[in-house]
Amino acid sequence: MSPKTETKASVGFKAGVKDYRLTYYTPEYQTKDTDILAAFRVTPQPGVPAEEAGAAVAAESSTGTWTTVWTDGLTSLDRYKGRCYDIEPVPGEENQFIAYVAYPLDLFEEGSVTNLFTSIVGNVFGFKALRALRLEDLRIPPAYSKTFQGPPHGIQVERDKLNKYGRPLLGCTIKPKLGLSAKNYGRAVYECLRGGLDFTKDDENVNSQPFMRWRDRFVFCAEAINKAQAETGEIKGHYLNATAGTCEEMMKRAVFARELGVPIVMHDYLTGGFTANTSLAHYCRDNGLLLHIHRAMHAVIDRQRNHGMHFRVLAKALRMSGGDHIHAGTVVGKLEGERDVTLGFVDLLRDDFIEKDRSRGIYFTQDWVSMPGVLPVASGGIHVWHMPALTEIFGDDSVLQFGGGTLGHPWGNAPGAVANRVALEACVQARNEGRDLAREGNEVIREACKWSPELAAACEIWKEIKFEFDVIDRL
């Protein structure tokens, strides 16, 4: 290239490392109804101003790179760039800020959680100028959420399919989670369903191992469901885990479940991936299957306060990708979950319209328009003494799932199921009569023990069991 050509080409272009603030920090910006909004908890490296850190997040998660490039002149950055439009300090934390970023809708492929996350929680989380970065919340505008199918069926359709109303649904995870033969596994399913549960469940890591291949498990569980339904007159189900090593194998398992006539299948949506999950959700809607979602691996992503992504974001992503149930913690059991935080994302799963409420960790008003809701599943270290609190916290539109709290009953699996069903019915009746379960819950359970020896035995065996540890992720 001649010196003359170099001079001409260099007009209007200045090479070098960018100061992100000049382009991506725009406090005067008025957000649009079609923007996707994000709230990031930003911990900059020492010496990095808050405005520069927030602008860097906006740049690196949208159109930016570390230097000026020639091809910037071939597009409209003002149209496509992310904008850090507000920054606020985090109370009680030194050198930590909430950076609010607005993204134009055109940056994202329609109906793709995979593409949404690849941008917003992609390479920016490894950016050296940031000591830590956490995505606290997203606002998904109707213009984007309407490009998703969402849950295969939703809460009301599920209740109609099951013909069960006015109470939480009851479930049980079969234990031990690994090692049972398919026939013994099916036996446990039958005993729990016959005893009064609505659902039983494969644990998240039950796929197709040498001790129990998936096809054998599916057949024996279908037999157990049919037998329990015939004996009880109630519609029953077992979450058959279709998660597999390939999408093709996953779909093959879902097809076989449909051919067996079972009502519900299951997927581990984080380890399986959003693309696989969305494909399975579409199949479930087209073929009348409910879809239960397990969140295995979520704590790797969401448990640290300063880095990663809050579960409320993963919950919103699941509602868009598709699932009729998702595990949501218990507040009172063995797994992490503060009450206000948990109730915040439970509302984001179930309700159509959720107002901004920082006291519950909700940074943006969320309008789901007509997208069906998802039933939250309370599971993990719970037993009959927790039933009043669970009924009061989660309400009717939930699934209360007792694994060890059913199968650990001293008299066996069916009596364990009976104990849980009696405890639930007693709590629902007491609530409907106007009693305060938060105050009178233990008394309600003790009264019910008079009429149920199975419940009395369960109350005795688990009266001292508690999981009293401080919650890590507080507001």
UniProtKB/Swiss-Prot annotation:
Residue numbers covered by the propeptide annotation in the UniProt entry: 1-2
GO-annotated cellular components: chloroplast
EC primary class: lyase
Positions where N6-carboxylysine occurs in the chain: 201
EC assignment: 4.1.1.39
Residues forming the catalytic site: 175, 294
GO biological process: photorespiration; reductive pentose-phosphate cycle
Purpose: RuBisCO catalyzes two reactions: the carboxylation of D-ribulose 1,5-bisphosphate, the primary event in carbon dioxide fixation, as well as the oxidative fragmentation of the pentose substrate in the photorespiration process. Both reactions occur simultaneously and in competition at the same active site.
Family (UniProt): Belongs to the RuBisCO large chain family. Type I subfamily.
PANTHER family listed in its UniProt record: RIBULOSE BISPHOSPHATE CARBOXYLASE (PTHR42704), RIBULOSE BISPHOSPHATE CARBOXYLASE LARGE CHAIN (PTHR42704:SF15)
Subunit architecture: Heterohexadecamer of 8 large chains and 8 small chains; disulfide-linked. The disulfide link is formed within the large subunit homodimers.
Name of protein: Ribulose bisphosphate carboxylase large chain
Organism the protein comes from: Pinus balfouriana
